[in-house]
Amino acid sequence: MAQAMLLMMPGVSTTNTIDLKRNALLKLQIQKIKPKSSTSNLFFSPLPSSSSSSSTVFKTLALFKSKAKAPKKVEKPKLKVEDGLFGTSGGIGFTKENELFVGRVAMIGFAASLLGEGITGKGILSQLNLETGIPIYEAEPLLLFFILFTLLGAIGALGDRGRFVDEPTTGLEKAVIPPGKDVRSALGLKTKGPLFGFTKSNELFVGRLAQLGFAFSLIGEIITGKGALAQLNIETGVPINEIEPLVLLNVVFFFIAAINPGTGKFITDDEEED
């Protein structure tokens, strides 16, 4: 009846009634599909506005600490001379290895001169005259050059680049004396290596002393005309025959020190350990 009345009303068209029906059906379908308010808050939370996002402040926390920067390596300048008296950077190309060789020659020469003076009673220059037949005054320039070279070499003025480094003494092979059948092993000494605990630095020091002794004995013989032992007699007043054991011990020591290789190795400036 209501529908018939609506149809018979002059101001209401049939199209409007159909639209109302459709709108009512759409509302029912939307209500069925639309979720509840509690679930909608969970899944469909509204995006924060620009005002709220600007007011909130986010704090970032680092899980891992930043790595500390390694300190910069400071390179030390390499010195060309280790302990030269005049600070010459190499001089004439003289190294400690060359100086060690000159020191060994000086030890052998000084020991031989003392032994020759003990046998012949004459000094180094007189023995040289006997061996060569050359008068001393003709060899004076050569002697002066030799004395000057020996003195400068003894004080390190010719340049002493490089240095000697002792070999490591740790380890089982160094600590235990290996068994053997020779005399040295029977006495409890090492079968290999140097007989004494002499290093190349010790040998260099003894060589410098031999160079100084050789040079000053030559200077003294030029002034006094007597050898090293006679000069010692003049200085101390002790007869030579009373100090013969000491002289022989000195000669033997210089010979052994000259021929016995010391431990250690020579390192130049270019081979310096990093």
Curated annotation (Swiss-Prot):
Post-translational modifications reported in the UniProt record: The N-terminus is blocked.
Transit peptide, residues from-to: 1-69
Organism superkingdom: Eukaryota
SUPFAM superfamilies recorded: Chlorophyll a-b binding protein
GO molecular function: identical protein binding; phosphoprotein binding
Annotated GO CC locations: chloroplast thylakoid membrane; photosystem II
Transmembrane segments: 105-125, 139-159, 204-224, 239-259
Residues in the signal sequence: none
Membership in a protein family: Belongs to the ELIP/psbS family.
Function noted in UniProt: Seems to be involved in non-photochemical quenching, a process maintains the balance between dissipation and utilization of light energy to minimize generation of oxidizing molecules, thereby protecting the plant against photo-oxidative damage.
Descriptive protein name: Photosystem II 22 kDa protein, chloroplastic
Organism: Spinacia oleracea (Spinach)
